[in-house]
């Protein structure tokens, strides 16, 4: 055995030789091993650091320098270590073998590493402690065995590691505390047994760990802690029992006299007993949130003079504020998601150093005066039931920087409530019931949130908030004062892109000191927002205001262009005048009964007139607010005028579509019924259907008034809201579009069936060619105009592809109401019924008499191809009697086609020739009386009928008779 002087001489010789080699040529020579080829080496004086990590090595390099002090072999493919592999590395102090595939380490693997202090073996596949290998490491101070598969720690696992200070055994498969193995570590200062499967902590489990300062036991399955479990931990300062299954408060902590930080959150503890922390007067931080706390002893948190952080969240059954008498050093208090209803008046006297008060998600209805809490910097009171803010509630809080009062029921704020808050930089009043906001004391605000206060239409100027950087308001019009409209409307993404500054992004973001403990407090205050208050006051060119104005939230004009403005006015004038004229001629033209189709067309004119009136209201608002719409936009959207406009628009458009569907279906069914049963449906069923259509349209228009859909989503007061609208509003708009699309499909199917039932040459089914053709024109025109509405609505609301808001707005303003003026124009210009009805209203001196109009009215009910009509026998008698009496005045100017009358319901059909009825086989009857019950086919020939345009030659009556040239 060498003597100590001999060893010293040997060591000095080695050092001198190494120094000589280091001072000579740095190129490797025959006397000096080179750095292994795949590794990266760095010299530190005479010592060497070798980094061989992440190289895919399967074996340890053999040519390592004996003076290597640091060796990193982590993240490779090592599967085994040969005995004596590191015996020549006598100066090695840190060895990293983490992230390999080691499942077993032989006994002599670390022999010769007498200077090793740090050994990292985490993230391997070890199933046991390599005890024999560790015995060769007398100087080891830090051992990492976490993230392995270790399930058992034998008693002698750490024998000989008398210098070990840090031990990581977390993320393994341990089911119990290795009590006997830990008794051999008297110098241990920090240990983690987290992320295992431990269920119980026995008594005296750590009795020999008198130097232990930090103990982590979180994320286990611990259900019970013995009364003396922590006996012997005289120097323990941090205890982490979070995320376990504790059922009762661990009274064993009373033996921890030096404990400063305690974590019990996310357990099943239901009660905190009286004097729970009596034995730990040095406690500074307690995290106790997310436990089903039902009881808190009145003295539980009293006289903890060092306590500065208390987090007690999720205790839903706690209704009283805890008594914090003697806890005068408390700086951060978090009591969220509890049932607290009232704050004691003397809370600030007990907590004079309080800086952060977080009481969100409680049931607080009234706030006391907090003027004695002079050091308060943040107050969180969101999701409570506060209704009013008094003058002295926050008075004299000169250090207050952030105040969160969102999601309450605040209706009134005293004008002087914020007047003394000179340091306030963030104020959140989202989703309250404010009508006005007092501005006194808010000049230093940099972030103001007012969203959700729908009754707050107050305009804010730049002078009110000279330092403001972020503003969130209920209406986009309130952003117009901050120059948002300077370069027309922009989307939110564009504004965010313009407000982005690379230098600000690259700047280091350090949390404020007052927020240092918030990661565990669940107090979700935005660090970036509060950082604005401490940054140097450099000028900022613009304010980031939301929601951003756009085509649906204009700043100056409701209608952006004169083209749209003139088009809307034209639609208004044409729809009101033309539909009024149609209504007048249809319903006031005389006592003659209306045909079913004509009744439906008249009802459609009334619906279209409502659409025109709604467009007129929008045009009037545009004219009255010309150039300054932002001042009135919020009040218009939330007012009764917008509701009435939207109601009329939806009622008119939906009634028009439904009535058009009814007209098409009625035409198709009538043809089928005439062919099958010889008669058309009764007019009463058509009237009932029309009333049903109007009732359904009224119901659809009333749904947004009951919060199903939304009229005030935009100043257009239409349910077709922009994509950023509420889901309920978008769903209602999609439902309307789908219903209308279904109606047009039904209409198309009905008319296809009608034409399929009328093959060429079959002329006995259609009784009113003009009205049937008019309905066909309505189907074509309205369907064609509705296609872009449906297409853009689906594309915009469902985000199928980008659609500019300007295009959507133009379609809603011009294309959507266009049928309201086009439908009556088609009737006025192309339907012969209008000219006849107009003559009845204003007869001219040369116009035919009423009898001639009656006959003409019957004759006009003819088909476009054969001009046949169904006429009752009583009507034919009137015509025949008139022919015998003489010609009415002016009748010579009115042309009638020649006709043949054929019985529809007699077995042997007859026809009229001269003054006799002749059977179909040619037999004549003298002065016969036609049957009173039944109908005749009136066949017109030799004339061009209004509305049909077809002519057939050959008159059958003598020309000398009164109607010989006409009937």
Swiss-Prot record:
Spans traversing the lipid bilayer: 568-588, 599-619, 645-665, 688-708, 728-748, 775-795, 810-830
Annotated ranges, domain LRRNT: 26-66
Molecular function via GO: G protein-coupled receptor activity; protein-hormone receptor activity
GO CC annotation, single: vesicle
Membrane topology (Cytoplasmic): 589-598, 666-687, 749-774, 831-967
Gene3D superfamilies: Rhodopsin 7-helix transmembrane proteins, Ribonuclease Inhibitor
Signal peptide: 1-22
Subcellular location: Cell membrane
Extracellular side: 25-567, 620-644, 709-727, 796-809
Residues glycosylated per entry: 77, 208
Disulfide bond positions: 642-717
GO-annotated biological processes: bone regeneration; cell population proliferation; positive regulation of cell migration; positive regulation of Wnt signaling pathway; tissue regeneration; Wnt signaling pathway
Positions of LRR repeats: 91-112, 115-136, 139-160, 163-186, 187-208, 211-232, 235-256, 258-279, 282-302, 303-325, 329-350, 353-374, 375-396, 399-420, 423-443
Annotated knockout phenotype: Simultaneous knockdown of LGR4, LGR5 and LGR6 results in developmental phenotypes, such as cleft palate and ankyloglossia, but not in tetra-amelia with lung agenesis.
Domain of life: Eukaryota
SUPFAM superfamilies assigned to the protein according to its UniProt record, in alphabetical order: Family A G protein-coupled receptor-like, L domain-like, RNI-like
PROSITE patterns, alphabetized: LRR
Alphabetic keyword roster: Cell membrane, Disulfide bond, G-protein coupled receptor, Glycoprotein, Leucine-rich repeat, Membrane, Receptor, Repeat, Signal, Transducer, Transmembrane, Transmembrane helix, Wnt signaling pathway
Family statement: Belongs to the G-protein coupled receptor 1 family.
Function: Receptor for R-spondins that potentiates the canonical Wnt signaling pathway and acts as a marker of multipotent stem cells in the epidermis. Upon binding to R-spondins (RSPO1, RSPO2, RSPO3 or RSPO4), associates with phosphorylated LRP6 and frizzled receptors that are activated by extracellular Wnt receptors, triggering the canonical Wnt signaling pathway to increase expression of target genes. In contrast to classical G-protein coupled receptors, does not activate heterotrimeric G-proteins to transduce the signal.
PANTHER family with a match to the protein in the record: GLYCOPROTEIN HORMONE RECEPTOR, LEUCINE RICH REPEAT CONTAINING G PROTEIN-COUPLED RECEPTOR 6
Name by which UniProt lists this protein: Leucine-rich repeat-containing G-protein coupled receptor 6
Species: Mus musculus
